[in-house]
């Protein structure tokens, strides 16, 4: 493989801002991220080694060239699928370990937020019915506590950001949305699609059993709110970055969200 050659650029880049390449460095395959965010660079410099020691497996930092703003990190060779996230107990276990760590006063974190303006921007793009739109506005008004939390969170725990090392260790990568916030933000992406309230209850129950604290129904409601926020985030990011898959995602949301909002309204808004 030639150094610097892109491998499935569309898949590797996903929706992040950095340009990502799989390259060969000193005879070893590594991930090269060009123009990574300050948040992700700081994560690998400050947290990667500690997290791996604690059993929160993340890619190892190989090198950061601050002159070129190029980050080299461990390549995790084996992908996992969506179903795996709910089949393997290590996923929840590692998230619990992460969430139990306190943030530092000098930490560099992504600022997650959900504003009325962002909601309206996404809804204008989606062109959903008035009832569905009102449901999203109502959830936004109930969401402030998701972003006031004192837990460290990945901020982007979807299936595409998990992989396995050759030795079988489960690794969570892509830390440009590393932040503080509610654990529901990391639990919502574990559920395929929009999911149902029963799905949220199951994940909440497993998480609380592992963390040994919390209330299942309350956490399930927060997962539902987080799901709605992620829709707003994804729609606005897709449009702003002119992602080639935008129309596919928008079509799916338009087909799915009205029924999802209708079925979830009673449980989440109660």
Residue ranges and their predicted role:
Residues 2-25:
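ATP-binding glycine-rich phosphate-binding loop
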Residues 184-215, 227-259:
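Active-site activation/catalytic loop segments of kinase-like enzymes and analogous catalytic loops
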Residues 1-5, 253-270:
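Regulatory N- and C-terminal appendages and interdomain linkers associated
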Residues 16-24, 140-185:
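Active-site acidic catalytic loop and adjacent metal/ATP-binding pocket
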Residues 67-84, 120, 228-247:
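A glycine-centered beta->alpha junction motif in the catalytic cores
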Residues 78-113, 129-136:
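Conserved kinase catalytic-core helix
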Residues 28-71, 81-100:
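A conserved alpha-helical element in kinase catalytic cores
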Residues 89, 171, 188-191:
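Glycine-rich, phosphate-binding/catalytic loops in enzymes
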């Amino acid at each position: 493989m030639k150094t610097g050659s892109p491998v499935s650029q569309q898949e590797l880049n996903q929706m992040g801002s950095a340009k990502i390449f799989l390259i060969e460095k000193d005879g070893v395959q590594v991930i090269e991220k060009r123009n990574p965010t300050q948040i992700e660079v700081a994560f690998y410099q400050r947290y990667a080694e500690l997290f791996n020691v604690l059993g929160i497996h993340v890619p190892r930092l190989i090198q950061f060239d601050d002159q070129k703003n190029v980050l080299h990190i461990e390549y995790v060779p084996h992908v996992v699928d969506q179903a795996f996230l709910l089949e393997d107990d290590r996923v929840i276990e590692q998230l619990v370990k992460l969430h139990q760590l306190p943030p530092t006063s000098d930490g560099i974190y992504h600022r997650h937020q959900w504003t009325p303006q962002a909601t309206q921007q996404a809804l204008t793009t989606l062109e959903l019915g008035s009832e569905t739109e009102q449901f999203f506005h109502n959830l936004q008004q109930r969401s402030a506590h998701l972003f006031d939390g004192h837990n460290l969170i990945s901020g982007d725990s979807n299936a595409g950001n998990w992989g396995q090392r050759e030795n079988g260790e489960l690794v969570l990568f892509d830390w440009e949305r590393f932040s503080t916030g509610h654990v529901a933000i990391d639990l919502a992406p574990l559920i395929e699609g929009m999911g149902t309230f029963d799905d949220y209850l199951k994940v909440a129950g497993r998480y609380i059993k592992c963390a040994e604290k919390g209330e299942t129904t309350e956490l399930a409601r927060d997962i539902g709110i987080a799901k709605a926020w992620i829709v707003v985030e994804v729609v606005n990011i897709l449009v702003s970055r002119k992602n080639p898959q935008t129309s596919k995602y928008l079509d799916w949301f338009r087909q799915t969200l009205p029924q999802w909002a209708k079925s979830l309204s009673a449980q989440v808004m109660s």
